[in-house]
Amino acid sequence: MKFGNGCWLQKEGIECFAPQEAYFVNKNDHEVVICAPTHHIAHRGDTLGGINLTIRVTAPAEGVIRVQTSHYLGVEDHSPKFDLNMDENRAMDVEETEDEIFVRSGNLSLRINKKNWSMSYERDGKVLTASSGRDLAYMRTQWTGFAYDMDPEGKAYMCQQLGIDVNEHVYGLGERFGALVRNGQSVDIWNEDGGTSTDQSYKKS
């Protein structure tokens, strides 16, 4: 699903809420939970409105870092999904400074800039990919402003974009008709498995 109208504009009725800073951080040896407001907090009046995102970082396996972003947890989830076989309490290395948070799992690390939000994924000191600006965002459709945010037709989505280098390619994303290399494509992903005689099959593109 595409939310943008080119690089600089959102589609009509779309509003983007991206984390701007880490307002406070709760951490232990198996998770980091960050409150990330979508606007900078200069004084306590800035805490009275706006949207906050909760970002949870864990390491379910060595060399793996999982980042989960949510807004308003607690609502029953009816989406199709399956349980994952992973260790929710696996220990990881966490270090926090005044400006950054470092999470390490094996030779993979995640560097988070707390003051001007950005995330950099690195292996053995080499940057693999990164996101900043509006790359990670909570998106609203049919947005009419905070004062009128009661539209039952409006929907919410989470969006994540990760940078890739020249000559890097994205493969797979399910069995679908089309080019094997997915660069530049918009691809829907779901957990349903179309059978041999269902209308889903592998025709979705």
Where are these regions (language model features)?
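A low-complexity, Ser/Thr/Gly/Pro-enriched, surface-exposed linker/loop concept
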Residues: 3-43, 49-99
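Catalytic and substrate-binding clefts that recognize carbohydrates or anionic sugar/phosphate headgroups
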Residues: 1-4, 15, 47-49, 70-72, ...
